């Protein structure tokens, strides 16, 4: 196999679309600046929108029609209104148009965008930067790559091509 010369990189310091077209995720450099446990999600850039409600508890009910999830699935939720914090969550209590996730205790509701196709989820818990190489040809991202950064205390550089 010949050397691949078309690998590119992009640096992300906030959640958003890193690459807006079909590509392969080749590697990730994580650079946390604080010692706290964070989950960073690298998702296929396919999202669906819905609403959420946290009625004074730690249970967040998300309503998205025909979401296609099962109990135990992992999703990245971007809360676009209200006061819940964006993060990666484990899905439970799945019904046709609803599911729940565990969140910090709150009373809030609003709109949410869900990324259900997580390509890679990386955890960091110290201030030591680290690189994760994706073996083989990388992971195919059919619609591009969305990066979910749950805090401003971690940045990332993606390598793709």
Show where each model-derived region lies.
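Surface-exposed, low-hydrophobicity beta-strand/loop segments enriched in small/polar/acidic residues
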Residues: 1-49, 74, 90-95, 102, ...
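Small/polar beta-strand repeat architecture
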Residues: 48-117
């Amino acid at each position: 196999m010949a050397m691949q010369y078309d690998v590119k990189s992009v640096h992300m310091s906030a959640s958003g679309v890193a690459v807006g077209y079909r590509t392969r995720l080749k590697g990730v450099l994580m650079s946390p600046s604080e010692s706290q446990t964070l989950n960073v999600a690298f998702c296929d850039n396919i999202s669906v929108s819905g609403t959420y409600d946290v009625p004074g508890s730690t249970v967040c009910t998300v309503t998205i029609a025909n979401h296609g999830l099962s109990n135990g699935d992992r999703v990245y939720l971007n809360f676009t209104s209200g006061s819940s914090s964006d993060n990666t969550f484990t899905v439970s209590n799945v019904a046709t148009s609803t599911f729940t996730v565990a969140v910090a205790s709150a009373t809030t509701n609003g709109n949410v965008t869900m990324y259900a196709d997580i390509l890679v989820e990386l955890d960091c818990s110290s201030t030591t930067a680290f690189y994760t190489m994706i073996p083989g040809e990388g992971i195919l991202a059919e619609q591009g790559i969305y990066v979910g950064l749950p805090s401003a205390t971690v940045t990332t550089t993606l390598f793709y091509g």
